[in-house]
Amino acid sequence: MIGLKGILKVIDNSGATLAECIRVVRAGKFASLGDEVVVVVKKARSGSSVTAANKVKRGDIHHAIIVRTKSPVRRPDGRYVRFDDNACVLVNKECEPLGTRILSVVANELRTKHHTKIASLAPRTI
C-alpha cells in the first residue's frame, strides 16, 4: 500500500530513478498493485538536458502505475506475494509507459488490471 509521501523506485528507462507519491488517483487513501498515482521525480539519471534516453528530470510531475509493493497482496488461490521494494513505471495521461524498456520484474496483477503493455515490456512477471 502506497500512501502520500511514499518513496518509489522507478524501473523503466525514462530517466528517473526515485519518485515520491503526491496523490492517489481513483483508489481511495492508499494505492496497491496496478493503481495509478501522481508522483514527483526526486532523483533522475545524470544528464545536462532532457535527451531521448532521459525523458524526465528532477522535479517533474508525472503519473505512474504501481508495479511492486512491500505490502503483501493476496492472490485468488490464497497465496500472498510481496516484494523487497516499492516500484513504479512512469506513464502518460493515456496510461502508456514513457520508457521503452522495463528493467526489472513486475507483479502478475497488472494483467488483470488492464496494464498489459507494461506486463509485456517486463522481462518477467511474478
From Swiss-Prot:
Q: Does the keyword Mitochondrion apply?
A: yes
**Keyword field:** Mitochondrion, Ribonucleoprotein, Ribosomal protein
A Pfam family annotated for this chain is: Ribosomal_L14
Where is the protein found, in the record's own terms? Mitochondrion
What are the GO cellular component annotations?
mitochondrial large ribosomal subunit; mitochondrion
Q: Name one GO molecular function term.
A: large ribosomal subunit rRNA binding
Q: Which InterPro entries match?
A: Ribosomal_uL14, Ribosomal_uL14_bac-type, Ribosomal_uL14_CS, Ribosomal_uL14_sf
Q: One of this protein's GO BP terms?
A: mitochondrial translation
Q: Which SUPFAM superfamilies match?
A: Ribosomal protein L14
Tell me, how does this one assemble?
Answer: Component of the mitochondrial large ribosomal subunit (mt-LSU). Mature yeast 74S mitochondrial ribosomes consist of a small (37S) and a large (54S) subunit. The 37S small subunit contains a 15S ribosomal RNA (15S mt-rRNA) and at least 32 different proteins. The 54S large subunit contains a 21S rRNA (21S mt-rRNA) and at least 45 different proteins.
Q: Which PANTHER family match?
A: 50S/60S RIBOSOMAL PROTEIN L14/L23, LARGE RIBOSOMAL SUBUNIT PROTEIN UL14M
Name the record gives this protein: Large ribosomal subunit protein uL14m
Taxonomic source organism: Schizosaccharomyces pombe (strain 972 / ATCC 24843) (Fission yeast)
Q: What is the lineage of its organism?
A: Eukaryota, Fungi, Dikarya, Ascomycota, Taphrinomycotina
